[in-house]
Amino acid sequence: MLTLKRIQQCKLLNTIHTTYNTSLVFDIIDMARTRTYIAGEWDGDLNAIDQLYRWNEGDKWNMHFTDAHKNGQCYDTSMPCTIKASLSERLGRSKTFILVVGNNTNTTRKGACSYQNCDNKQFNYFTGQFSCKVIGKSYSTESFIDYECRLAYNAWLRNEMKIVVLYNAASVNRSKCPEKLRNVGTHVEMKSYNYNWQEYRYDYQKVKKAIEG
């Protein structure tokens, strides 16, 4: 016959067991939703971004890439503030932020809002300025890359984001990196000299170590 004390002990053990399993389930779900976000100057560094995809699709990695620039038509036809809202949502599901840096990364202005023929602007009578209904602030001069870097940096400050900066070159030149990420995260060149091919080629092991390390 179970005593009152024994019944209480059983209830306590069952509570601990249930709590542990619930926590474990949530940990597994969180891991399953991990994303790796790729940003870069699509026009100039397509070769480097494509190389990351080839490595991942070749079963070398097991990452869920979120490439904000994959749908080029969306970038050409949608309003910048609408796109930035989508970028913010995608970044919110990501644990790792990869920025591919090339010659034009720090100077491109694609994505800077101009509020020309935009249906998402509204006049704020308190400030006397137009503001964006999507991102909730006034005129934005940030490019898409600047916007992504700022969000990634803020997430990094909260210990929610790992930042990896990959240079589409054989050396690291931080002056080409947007200032927001210039001194944070891991900075690695993507290319090394291959003596067999007698040329600079993308270095899988070096990039893998930077992303997974």
Model regions: which residues?
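Short, glycine/charged-enriched secondary-structure capping and boundary segments
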Residues: Q51-R54, A112-Y115, P178-L181
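Beta-hairpin (beta-strand-turn-beta-strand) motif
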Residues: G102-N104, N168-A169
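C-terminal interaction surface of TIR/SEFIR-family domains
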Residues: F26-D30, R35, Y167-G213
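A short helix->loop->beta-strand "cap" motif at the edges of active sites that frequently abuts
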Residues: A155-I163
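Conserved TIR/SEFIR loop-to-helix hotspot centered on a Trp-containing motif
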Residues: T105-A155
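Hydrophobic/aromatic beta-strand patches that form the interior of the parallel beta-sheet core
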Residues: I98, K162-L166
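Conserved N-terminal substructure of TIR/SEFIR domains
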Residues: L2-L4, C10-F97, V101, K208-G213
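Short catalytic/ligand-binding loop motif for oxyanion handling, primarily in non-cytosolic enzymes
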Residues: D45-A48, N106-K110, S171-P178
